[in-house]
Every structure is written in C-alpha cells, then in structure tokens.
C-alpha cells in the first residue's frame, strides 16, 4: 500500500486571511512561541536567498510592456504645480515607478547580506530591460518613453548595486555588460 503524505488540517479561517492579517498573525505567533523564531528566520532567509533571474526578467518585462498608457493623459501636458510635462518625461516616470519596487527588493536582499540573490535580481532586471528594447508596440508607455528609457532604467539598477558595494553578476551577457557598465567603475565579479 502506498504511503500518503500527512493531511494538512483544515484551516478555513486562516485560508481567508488577507496578506496583512497573515503578517500580523505571524508576528503574534512568534511573540507567543519564541521557540519557533529561529525556524521562521531560517525559512525567511531561504526564501529571500532564492532568486530566479529568468523569472525576474519575465516579470519586469511584462510589467513595463503592460504599463497603463491611460495614465499619460493625467501626467503629461499642463500639470498643476509642475507646469508643462512632456509625454516622454511622464512615460519615463511611470516606468521608473514600476521598476522601483524591484530595486527596493534588490536593496533589501543586499542589506540582509544575501549578495548572490541581489546580484541575480539585478541580472534579471537587466535582462528584462534589455528585452524591452525590442518589439515595442506603438501607443505603449515604453514607446512614448523613447528608445533610451531602458538604458536609463538599467543605470538605476547599476547604481543600486554600486550603493550596495556589489559587483555586476558574473553571468551578465556581454551585450548587457557593454550597455550597463560603459563608463562605470563596476566590473563583473571574478
């Protein structure tokens, strides 16, 4: 007879908690049961240390390609308190705002000492940005931002690595290396 895995107990209320409620509950459990804190920390490190650069690349490429072009009507043209904002400037700002959470995640991992994960995150972001240089559809935020926007965003990734005192990933493709490190003191790690 085949041995089955133990069944997870039914937890209908837990299953319906929001992300915030789950976070609060985890905090309460760790206070009530400090003996599980070390295991929770180990699991957290394990989760944050694992980054799939290809998945990051796909995610950021999709996010930037699917940016909501309708926002341009609110952010370009005459804007109260800013004067006239060109459509390419507004589009670049939208893309920068979409990239920022990923940059924050890269910095978070670097600050935790998870340098390989931060490098893989950077590699994925750079690959995704490079992919966005091709086959840009007219009428998208990427198209309105102009052909240099992905290079500008790649410099943001490079700058975050530099601030974290990290080198570019070893497996950075040469075409990305030329674009991102031109004129930079950063070199791929040996």
Where are these regions (language model features)?
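Eukaryote-biased, non-catalytic alpha-solenoid scaffold regions
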Residues: 1-12, 20-24, 31-190
């Amino acid at each position: 007879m085949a041995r089955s895995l133990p069944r997870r107990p039914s937890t209908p209320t837990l299953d319906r908690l929001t992300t915030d409620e789950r976070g609060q509950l985890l905090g309460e459990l760790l206070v009530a049961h400090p003996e599980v804190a070390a295991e929770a920390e180990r699991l957290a490190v394990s989760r944050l240390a694992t980054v799939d650069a290809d998945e990051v690349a796909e995610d950021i490429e999709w996010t930037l390609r699917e940016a909501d072009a309708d926002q341009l009507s609110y952010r370009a043209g005459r804007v109260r308190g800013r004067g006239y904002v060109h459509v390419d400037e507004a589009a670049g700002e939208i893309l920068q705002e979409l990239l920022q959470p990923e940059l924050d995640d890269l910095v978070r991992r670097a600050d935790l000492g998870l340098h390989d994960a931060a490098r893989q995150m950077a590699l994925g972001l750079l690959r995704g940005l490079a992919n966005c240089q091709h086959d840009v559809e007219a009428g998208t935020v990427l198209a309105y931002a102009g052909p240099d926007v992905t290079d500008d965003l790649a410099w943001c990734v490079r700058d975050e690595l530099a601030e974290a005192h990290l080198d570019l990933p070893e497996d950075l493709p040469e075409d990305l290396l030329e674009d991102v490190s031109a004129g930079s003191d950063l070199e791929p790690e040996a």
